[in-house]
Amino acid sequence: MEGKLRNMTAIYITKNNQMLMLYRIGSRVVLPSWCGIGGHFEKDELNDAKSAMLRELYEEVGLSEKDLEHLVFKYITLRAKNGEIRQNYYFFADLKENTVLKNDCNEGRLEWVDYDSVLKKEMPFTAKKMLEHYMSTGRFDGKVYGGVTTPEGIVFTELEDFSKDRA
């Protein structure tokens, strides 16, 4: 492994016990599959995952932060693949009531999926394991999680700011 990084971000938007999923076609890094809205960081976004996510959200579905409520950063995952370290930053939000979502997307097909069907969709390994944790645990708490991907899944730990106690 050469120490190359690939920084990516995604947002999963919910409304009425459904999650907005994108059937992404033509990705450079994954086969056609279901995922959140998102993509790669631009060079000027390397220290700002939220800005990268908001740019991708606008480019792909025409939404901005004002269309969302309860926007939270929930997960960062690491995975070694194809000689690089892939860092994924995952956000979650609710779509504000009366927000109009365009039906077309230049990256693939959008679909509102019932919560109980989300995990039945074919999706990238890391996204699926993260969503399994989110659906069983993460959506019920205010924690932020870090995860390291293994062939068996993702090992999650809560990210805690302990700088007040230590130098």
Where are these regions (language model features)?
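Short, well-ordered beta-strand micro-motif
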Residues: 13, 90-94, 112-114
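Hydrophobic pocket-lining residues within nucleotide cofactor-binding pockets
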Residues: 41, 95-96, 115-118
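Conserved N-terminal beta-strand and adjoining loop/helix that marks the start
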Residues: 1-21, 41-42
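A short coil-to-beta-strand element that immediately follows conserved catalytic motifs
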Residues: 64-74
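Conserved Nudix-box catalytic region and its N-terminal flanking loop in Nudix hydrolases
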Residues: 18-58, 145, 149-167
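Active-site-adjacent beta-strand/loop module that shapes the phosphate/pyrophosphate-binding cleft
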Residues: 17, 77-100, 129-138
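NUDIX/MutT-family hydrolases
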Residues: 102-133, 157-163
